[in-house]
């Protein structure tokens, strides 16, 4: 998506060679009209896949996942990183956050992910693939079908997407980055 690439180049901040800050429009401050356009683009790429639910993980994936779900006219559910005391009947998966340097358990209430669903996973970033693997695990636990994943920004050099594609998973990415360093971003 050219508009996204242009925004990344104009507003993104590369920290080291592995971290891309896009907090002016995606991860802290949100540009709602732009989020809706990205959501429509991802929804269009999965049109006809029979999707009945969109799944993401809190927090930065929620805005785009909601935009995708709105375009598909289906509900969105997000995995929580802290299980509420009121939740007992949940699917759980452990993921490792390289950004935060910690493992967390993500949970989804079983009542929001029935076995007859066809799920599209949506997230803001795909790097090592830990969050995506955890969400795939939750979908598998539920017995639901998995249509694939829609990703806003994929860092190809961190190989998470390649590993999941090798397992047969369909992943659609709006902006794929081959490499980056301060002052330079190279798209695929």
From Swiss-Prot:
Any one Gene Ontology BP term: XMP salvage
Biological function: Converts the preformed base xanthine, a product of nucleic acid breakdown, to xanthosine 5'-monophosphate (XMP), so it can be reused for RNA or DNA synthesis.
Binding site for 5-phospho-alpha-D-ribose 1-diphosphate: 127-131
GO MF terms held by the record: xanthine phosphoribosyltransferase activity
Species whose genome carries this gene: Heliobacterium modesticaldum (strain ATCC 51547 / Ice1)
InterPro entries: PRibTrfase_dom (IPR000836), PRTase-like (IPR029057), Pur/Pyrimidine_PRTase (IPR050118), Xanthine_PRibTrfase (IPR010079)
Cytoplasm as UniProt keyword: yes
EC numbers: 2.4.2.22
Domain of life of the source: Bacteria
Name of the protein described by the UniProt record: Xanthine phosphoribosyltransferase
Binding site for xanthine: 20, 27, 155
Similarity-based family: Belongs to the purine/pyrimidine phosphoribosyltransferase family. Xpt subfamily.
Subunit structure: Homodimer.
Keyword Calcium: no
Keywords from the named record: Cytoplasm, Glycosyltransferase, Purine salvage, Transferase
Gene Ontology CC terms: cytoplasm
Catalyses which reaction(s): XMP + diphosphate = xanthine + 5-phospho-alpha-D-ribose 1-diphosphate
Annotated pathway: Purine metabolism; XMP biosynthesis via salvage pathway; XMP from xanthine: step 1/1
Cellular localisation: Cytoplasm
């Amino acid at each position: 998506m050219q508009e996204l690439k242009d925004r990344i180049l104009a507003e993104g901040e590369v920290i080291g060679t592995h971290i891309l800050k896009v907090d002016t429009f995606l991860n802290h401050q949100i540009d709602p009209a732009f989020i809706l356009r990205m959501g429509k683009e991802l929804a269009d790429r999965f049109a006809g896949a029979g999707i009945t639910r969109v799944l993401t993980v809190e927090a930065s994936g929620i805005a785009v996942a909601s935009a995708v779900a709105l375009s598909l006219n289906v509900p969105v559910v997000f995995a929580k990183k802290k299980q509420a005391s009121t939740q007992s009947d949940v699917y759980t998966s452990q993921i490792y956050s390289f950004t935060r340097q910690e493992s967390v358990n993500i949970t989804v209430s079983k009542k929001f992910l029935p076995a007859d669903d066809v799920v599209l996973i949506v997230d803001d970033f795909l790097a090592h693939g830990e969050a995506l693997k955890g969400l795939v695990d939750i979908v598998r636990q539920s017995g639901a079908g998995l249509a694939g994943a829609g990703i806003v920004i994929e860092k190809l050099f961190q190989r998470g997407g390649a590993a999941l594609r090798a397992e047969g998973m369909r992943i659609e990415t709006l902006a794929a980055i081959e490499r980056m360093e301060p002052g330079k971003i190279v798209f695929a």
